[in-house]
Design a protein with these regions (language model features):
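Disulfide-bonded cysteines in secreted/extracellular proteins and peptides
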Residues: 18, 47-49, 109, 133, ...
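Small side chains
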Residues: 10-11, 15-17, 106, 126, ...
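Structural signature of tandem-repeat unit edges
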Residues: 89-103, 110-124, 134-147, 157-169
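Consensus positions within tandem repeat domains that build extended binding/scaffold surfaces
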Residues: 127-131, 149-154
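Bacterial Sec-dependent N-terminal signal peptides
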Residues: 1-28
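N-terminal capping/linker segments that flank leucine-rich repeat
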Residues: 18-103, 119, 143, 166
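Intrinsically disordered and other compositionally biased segments
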Residues: 6-7, 152, 166
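Intrinsically disordered, low-complexity serine/threonine-rich segments
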Residues: 11, 22-27, 38, 121, ...
Length: 169
């Protein structure tokens, strides 16, 4: 398994520039903390900070358990999987409120440009997670990931740099 992981990381490095994240002790400009969550215009609705209508509607349709027209922080924390494959989403602003998210599928989201998963400490970077997201130009990974799945960033032609946490082997 370790050989496959090493070969996969080597393959990523050929197509995308990578750099290891440095510990906050060695580099005070790069703290080992997640990015701040966006402000919530409606403190009772995590979707109120989302700037992508398709992502927002997906969340209302799938996670508004009590059907009050809002996705509360409690409802968001119960979400373990978000499947956005082949959706025309551009950003995932607000995804950090889904604190127990384990599985994210953005395969073939050709319009997706930026993703910040630094607050999603349980998410796994699975196989083909961002497969052919050709406009993806920036991604922030959680500092605690241990491995990156096969072809996770295959076809992400706009992605020129990924900071890979030190724990990834």
């Amino acid at each position: 398994m370790k050989t496959l992981t090493i070969l996969f990381v080597a393959a990523i490095m050929m197509g995308v520039g990578c750099s290891k994240s440095e510990d906050s002790e060695n580099n005070p400009d790069k703290p080992d903390k997640p990015s701040p969550l966006p402000d919530l215009p409606d403190p009772n609705d995590v979707c109120s900070c989302m700037d992508d209508i398709i992502f927002m509607q997906y969340c209302y349709d799938n996670f508004d358990v009590n059907k009050d027209g809002k996705v509360s922080k409690i409802e968001a924390s119960a979400v373990a999987k978000i499947d956005l494959a082949r959706q025309e989403i551009k950003t995932l602003t607000g995804i950090g409120y889904f604190s127990n998210l384990e599985i994210l599928n953005c395969k073939e989201c050709h319009e997706l440009t930026t993703v910040d998963l630094s607050n999603n400490l349980k998410v796994r970077i699975g196989d083909e997670m961002f497969y052919t997201c050709s406009k993806l130009s920036k991604i922030v990974l959680p500092n605690n990931i241990l491995e990156i799945g096969e072809s996770a960033f295959y076809g992400c032609s706009s992605l020129k740099n990924i900071d890979i946490p030190d724990k990834v082997t």
